[in-house]
A protein has these predicted regions:
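Residues forming the flavin
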Residues: 1-56, 63-195
């Protein structure tokens, strides 16, 4: 099963992306026929060196690193891709529980991970049960995949308990910004990726 803290799968995925289809081709070779939301193929890549806050220099194509050539890739909304993947998973029998977050790791008697416990619902600001109280559920699993982001509280607990960072370089984090720009339609070129 999948526990999704958002109201629906994809609710917290705001990013657009340039999407390479290799993994999708392997999972769902008929993804086009199934209506995957990959509708805008990349037609060109432009890369600019920003000289200052007013001017940039376009890098010639022959100087563009191979990894920045997006031929065969698509410009997508990752929220839409995640929603579509959820539909495919449900069609294969995967149970998805939107609106629930994993609040605790469920450990087996031998100390191994045995699943998660979802958060209690129907509690007030002080954490006291209201009339609508529903205790968290124990979701037991042979395998548990934690996908809560780069600095999730359960991940931190597991890193500490199993000493996963022992002898490793510390993780580094940066702040990213997501913006939606309104631009003059005359300046828009469908399928153009600008770096």
């Amino acid at each position: 099963c999948v526990v999704e803290k958002g109201s629906e799968v994809g609710a917290h995925i705001l990013s657009g992306a340039v999407f390479e289809t290799r993994a999708l081709d392997e999972l769902f070779p008929d993804w086009k026929e199934k209506g995957a939301p990959l509708n805008t193929p990349v037609v060109a890549d432009d890369i600019y060196w920003l000289n200052n806050d007013k001017k940039g220099t376009k890098i010639p194509g022959f100087m563009t690193p191979k990894t920045m050539h997006n031929d065969g890739n698509y410009i997508v909304s990752m929220g839409n891709v995640c929603r579509w993947l959820a539909e495919q998973a449900e069609a294969l029998g995967v149970e998805i529980f939107p609106g629930f977050s994993a609040s605790e790791v469920l450990f087996n008697e031998d100390g191994s991970v045995g699943g998660v416990i979802t958060g209690d619902m129907g509690v007030d600001k002080e954490g006291k049960p209201k009339d609508s109280f529903m205790p968290g559920m124990e979701l037991k699993a042979k395998y548990t995949v934690f996908a809560e982001g780069c600095h999730g509280h359960l991940g931190k607990e597991l890193i500490e308990k199993f000493e996963l960072s022992k002898g490793q370089s510390p993780q580094h984090y940066v702040i990213g910004f997501k913006e939606i720009w309104d631009i003059d339609p005359a300046k828009h070129q469908e399928g153009l990726v600008v770096h």
